[in-house]
Amino acid sequence: LPLQLQGHNVGTEHTLVLHQEEQAWTFTGITSQPTPSLLRSLSAPVLLDYPFTEAELLTLLAHDSDAFNRWEAAQRLSLRIATNAIAATAETATEKEQNHANLLPQSVVDALRLVLEHPQLDAAFKELVLTLPSESYIAEQLDSVDPQRIHSVREAMRRQLALALQPQWQAA
């Protein structure tokens, strides 16, 4: 996607350096809302609280050329799905029902399939992207922790991925 930062030449990438708590930049000629790929190639540990939509995270997961951002998108999507499922099961589903639920939307499974099938991506990187957040990390994100529910939800997600991506796993 060519970008035209107001007052600069057209390019496909622009590095914007933050020097203040709040800053604004204007891009021209954009006809739709872009998906930001933030903190590209950054090596320092930074926590960024940006309200990515599911569609933006799916775009980053499937297409971002920055490996960390691709991994982070997968982690954010998986964590969001897990925490929502944990909250929902607390109110509605029994554990047995939860173990057989398809928690991951098909769009997430398809984006993960693209990663697994990508011929230029390293096998070790694919493994990282396809690894769900740990039970302990999921627990850290919750106000009320139910270890059995966390385990049940994560296992249901893991099982769903294993079954949905079995042909790709075997071919990899």
Language-model region placement:
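Long, ordered, helix-rich scaffold segments
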Residues: 28-172
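Exposed aromatic-hydrophobic patches
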Residues: 12-30
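Polar, glycine-rich mid-to-C-terminal structural blocks
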Residues: 1-11
